[in-house]
């Protein structure tokens, strides 16, 4: 897909900071979603989050930069990203009632590995033999966590894996959008359409499949929130909005292959939340898979930094007789 976009500035330090903050917000949001799924369908929760985000972002954008900033020639990319997000995270949350919190997110965190692969395929970001080997190790960790063929295998484990694919693709789309549109606009066009996208998904699923009582969180229904849960719905929407804004910003201003490994900070947060909130102790296979996935991601990030420094040195050497005279980028790695 070829789209004329403004070339985004590369600011890795700011990008990493935004991504780490987004992981904290995402973990908090997902924990609240797991609780709310006991009473409300996933379509309603994602739809409410989209409505709350729209109610906040739309007037904020108009106030900050004017209504004209909403106009964009990149609307096909924004719509594609919205579909990927809504579809992927509907499947992600659908797995929560059947699996432990840490188990679901461990499988989902094949996404950074897939992001690195998609970045090589679509953005021509290089993956050398070292990082290629690390990707293989990471995917072995995913297989261990999913445990296909084992007696404990659950088909719902495929749902967060599909979400990982859509998430990785959405970050590649974000990089294509670059900084042509502001982070607020990107967030609005990702979250606002989700209200309608998940409604169509929920209606379609229930139209073709007669869901049993164990799938009540997938029924197409929008019950009136109780006084006790309404504040949590609002807080979840606000926290989710900030999470998406931060992660959109991160992938706009830094290479996808550099950002991807820092997504793994979510995993230890999820393990702690799962134990504290639900008393969950993931099986050994989940811990082994998680360890391999994290090790793979950290090594990929390390190789990215090494490669960037070598490329910078090669670029500087032929043009500067004295290293001291060479200007350095303040945001370089």
Q: What is the role of each PLM region?
A:
Residues 2, 14-15, 40-87, 166-170, ...:
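Transmembrane alpha-helices of multi-pass small-molecule transport proteins
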Residues 2, 268-333:
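C-terminal-most transmembrane helix of multi-pass membrane proteins
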Residues 14-20, 67-91, 155-161, 212-242:
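Loop-to-transmembrane-helix transition segments
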Residues 36, 45, 49, 95, ...:
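Hydrophobic/aromatic residues within transmembrane alpha-helices
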Residues 105-110, 177-193, 241-275:
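Helix-helix packing/entry segments at the starts of transmembrane helices
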Residues 130-147, 163, 285-304:
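Hydrophobic transmembrane alpha-helices of multi-pass small-molecule transport proteins
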């Amino acid at each position: 897909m070829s789209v004329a976009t403004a070339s985004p500035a590369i600011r890795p330090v700011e990008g990493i900071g935004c991504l780490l903050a987004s992981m904290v917000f995402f973990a908090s949001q997902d924990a609240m979603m797991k609780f709310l799924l006991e009473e409300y369908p996933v379509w309603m929760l994602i739809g409410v989050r989209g409505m709350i985000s729209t109610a906040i972002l739309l007037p904020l954008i108009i106030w900050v930069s004017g209504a004209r900033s909403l106009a964009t020639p990149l609307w096909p990319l924004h719509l594609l990203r919205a579909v990927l997000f809504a579809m992927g995270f509907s499947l992600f949350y659908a797995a929560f009632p059947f699996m432990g919190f840490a188990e679901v997110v461990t499988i989902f965190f094949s996404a950074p590995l897939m992001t690195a692969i998609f970045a090589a395929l679509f953005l021509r970001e290089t993956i050398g033999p070292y990082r290629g080997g690390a990707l293989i190790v990471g995917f072995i960790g995913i297989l261990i966590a999913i445990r296909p063929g084992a007696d404990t295998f659950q088909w719902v484990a495929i749902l967060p894996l599909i979400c990982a694919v859509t998430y990785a693709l959405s970050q590649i789309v974000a990089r294509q959008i670059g900084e042509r549109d502001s982070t607020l606009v990107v967030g609005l066009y990702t979250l606002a359409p989700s209200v309608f996208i998940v409604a169509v998904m929920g209606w379609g699923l229930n139209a073709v499949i007669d869901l049993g009582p164990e799938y009540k969180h997938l029924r197409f229904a929008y019950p009136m929130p109780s006084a006790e849960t309404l504040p949590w719905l609002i807080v979840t929407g606000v926290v989710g909005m900030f999470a998406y804004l931060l992660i959109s910003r991160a992938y706009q201003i830094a290479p996808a292959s550099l950002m991807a490994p820092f997504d793994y900070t979510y995993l230890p947060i999820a393990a702690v939340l799962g134990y504290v909130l639900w008393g969950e102790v993931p099986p050994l296979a989940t811990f082994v898979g998680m360890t391999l996935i994290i090790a793979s991601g950290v090594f990929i990030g390390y190789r990215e930094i090494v490669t960037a420094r070598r490329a910078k040195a090669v670029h500087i050497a032929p043009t500067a007789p004295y290293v001291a005279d060479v200007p350095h980028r303040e945001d370089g790695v």
